[in-house]
Each structure stands twice: as structure tokens, then as C-alpha cells.
A protein has these predicted regions:
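A short glycine-rich, Lys/Arg-flanked "PGG" loop and its adjoining helix->strand segment in the class I
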Residues: 59-74
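Residues lining the SAM
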Residues: 47-49, 78
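Conserved class I S-adenosyl-L-methionine
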Residues: 74-111
Length: 192
């Protein structure tokens, strides 16, 4: 089962599923609306890069995760570190607060998948500190098994990056001085 707000992402996922002969279902919807489209529980819920920055309400997000996990089910989460989102695009100065203080409205050329794409768009994002993420997960009946931070990104998706090992990127002038990614593994409590 895969869920995404982007119809293009769903189309791409369906194509990959077809190419790999995977029997997978996909739902295109706002994650907050998922209970309207799905009534099933899972052993694992996995959420990856670039997801929560689009969401204003992490309590609602964590409620959704908990709702769709079976008791003792595992939540696996990997995301760009909130420290990364504090910087300007070139990582030269701090432009934003670490903590969520409301919507950030920006205009950007290119896309996160193709920095050179001939497109300019306005978007709305939210910064979420680690305590906001962890506390909402715990508040919604999950127990944190691990929280890890990494000083690199597996993707070359930021300005001024350098690959220091295969598929490991850092901001060139910051080297290993900032966290770039974090991961959380949590388990839904048996009684929630």
C-alpha cells in the first residue's frame, strides 16, 4: 500500500510496481484524509524523505500513523534533519527558526527532483523540531526504539553538496558539522 498527495508520484509508483511485477495498491490523497479511503491496519508504516515539511499538524499525522498500525506494529521514519531547513538555499546563513512557528511561504525555481527545471513555483512548508516529532509520536501510543542522526544525505538534492562516499552527500563548506538526516523506529504499544 502506498499513499501520496502527488498524482505524478502515484503514477510513477504504479509504473515501478508494474515493472517489478509487484502487487501493490496506491492511494492519491491528503494523508489527513486517508481514513476516508482506507480501513486496514499494517505491520509496518514507512515514511521517508520530504514528507512532514508539507504538514502543518504533526499530532494529526501521528494519529494517522497510529490508526493504521497493528498493535506491536513498527513505524519506520527517515527525514531530512530540521537543522537543514534553517539555512538559506546556499547554506551561507540561517534564515529560519528551528522550531515550528507557522507556515513558511517561498518561491523557488526548479523542483526538488530537478534543480534546473524551467519552472518557478510558490510553496508552503513548516519546520518541525525533533522534540515536536518525537512527542507527537509518543503521544499517539508509539514507543520510540531508536532515534539516530546522520551527518550526510543519501541524495544530492541540496546546493553546494559534495559526495564524500558513494551515495553520501554533505554541504561542502560545512562538511560533517551539521546533522542532515535522522531516523526513528517506533513500535505501537499493544494496548493502543
Amino acid at each position: 500500500m502506498g499513499v501520496d498527495l502527488s498524482d505524478k508520484a502515484i503514477k510513477s509508483a504504479k509504473q515501478l510496481s508494474k515493472e517489478t511485477s509487484s502487487n501493490t495498491t496506491f492511494i492519491c490523497c491528503d494523508i489527513y484524509d486517508l481514513p476516508r479511503y482506507l480501513d486496514q491496519r499494517f505491520d509496518i508504516v514507512f515514511t521517508s524523505y520530504g514528507t512532514i515539511g508539507w504538514l502543518p499538524d504533526l499530532n494529526k499525522w501521528a494519529e494517522i500513523i497510529s490508526r493504521f498500525l497493528k498493535p506491536n506494529g513498527q513505524f519506520v521514519f527517515v527525514e531530512f534533519h530540521p537543522v537543514v531547513w534553517m539555512f538559506d538555499d546556499n547554506f551561507e546563513k540561517i534564515d529560519y527558526r528551528y522550531f515550528n512557528s507557522g507556515a513558511i511561504i517561498e518561491s523557488e525555481s526548479g523542483t526538488y527532483a530537478d534543480k534546473n527545471a524551467d519552472i518557478t513555483q510558490e510553496y508552503v512548508m513548516w519546520n518541525h523540531g525533533l522534540s515536536e516529532v518525537v512527542n507527537n509520536i509518543v503521544k499517539n501510543g508509539l514507543e520510540i526504539n531508536s532515534l539516530n542522526e546522520y551527518d550526510y544525505s543519501p541524495y544530492d538534492c541540496f546546493n553546494k553538496t559534495k559526495e564524500f562516499e558513494p551515495r553520501k552527500y554533505r554541504i561542502e563548506h560545512l562538511d560533517d558539522k551539521i546533522p542532515m538526516v535522522y531516523s526513528i523506529v517506533a513500535k505501537k504499544k499493544n494496548n493502543s
